[in-house]
Amino acid sequence: MSAVDGGSKRGVSRRVFLGGAAWAAGCAVLWAANRMLGRIPAVRAQPEELTPQAYFPLAMKRYPQPKVVRVHAAAATSWDFQTGWYGEYVDQAVVKQMLERGLLELTGGGSMQGAWAMLLPGYSSGRKIAVKVNLNNCRSCDDSDNVIDALIEPVNALISSMVQAGVEAEDIWVYDASRRIPARFYERRENQQASYIDRFGCADQTATFNHVHPSLKVSFSHPQMVTDRWLTDLLYDASYVINMPILKRHGTNPVTLGFKNHFGSLDSLGGAGDDNPHPYINPQDDRYSVDFSPLVEINANRNIAQKTVLTVGDALFGASSVGATPAPWTSFDGSPNSLLLSRDPVAIDCVMCDLLRAEWGLDDAAYDYLMLAEQRGLGTFETGDPWGGGYNRLDYRYVEL
């Protein structure tokens, strides 16, 4: 199958995203310029000096053209969208092949050892790797509904590839610091040495917020957001961060992808009235502004920005809204059956936005936080057509298994 086919049978009924690649490549530049017109670059705080305990592998990162890889395998899932829990219909062996193939394509390495040597520069035994999963819809340790949440299979595949490359499993922390890790996720883990950490004690450990270092404090530039939030302590103790969002839309922010996944790294999202971050990510709220995004300010924290070595987007099923049950996609003729990988957190969110927009449509405001993120130096922004050649700044690659 060619890259243009994009992992599905594109019939007459298929939507042609934004009028095709040529339109996307030309008009996206004009559209983005109009959205950004009149913006004032955010004021950046002076970086703090940290102790040697906090190792920043990306402090001197210099990447060539940002690369985003999408790996598709029709055999990855087999759910009929009716019977039982969708998580029972995922082929672990296929997902491992997808993840490993994606890592090789992303890094150009000839083996898992070579790929992870690039992704984990300076790794040695004892340096921790924090893996952020999205279990936002899990409300109990024995959660059993069919609402979209993280699946264990991509996590198992990720850990397996790292261990294969020589990483100590004990150095891997899988976490959601604001939610529960349910039994149906935790009990299906393949590696017993990696640690699983949540907010409510459903797994191995409970995430702590002891403010172990001032660099974990997240202060917002908006004058109405006066309450400081704190990142979980493990992000200071970790040397590397891997982000594993789910491909889905949202009801408040138009999308919930990699940047929003780190809401689950904070001690609290609460706050009365204007001190709550949610109005500022909702384009329908009067308090929303294209010049401010709490998502960007959270992800700009150096414990995230300077430690994130990889984002793996779980698009095995995806969802049309934050609390939806997976449903067939028109643009994939069923489940997306895909994993996306990138070293650039902005670029991969752009491509995932484009996939969501092609299927369900998105307001232009869905991309605002990504334009701000590029201004903050967090990555590369571009909209385009993931079904064809609609990217100029991004090196978008499609792999079919």
Model-derived features with residue positions:
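Phosphate-coordinating loops and pocket residues in cytosolic domains that bind phosphorylated ligands
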Residues: 19
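Extended, low-polarity segments enriched in aliphatic/aromatic residues
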Residues: 60-125, 136-145, 149-157, 164-401
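Alpha-helix initiation and N-capping motif
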Residues: 27-30, 349
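C-terminal segment of N-terminal export signals and the immediately downstream linker at the start
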Residues: 31-73
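N-terminal secretory signal peptides
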Residues: 1-12, 23-27, 35-42
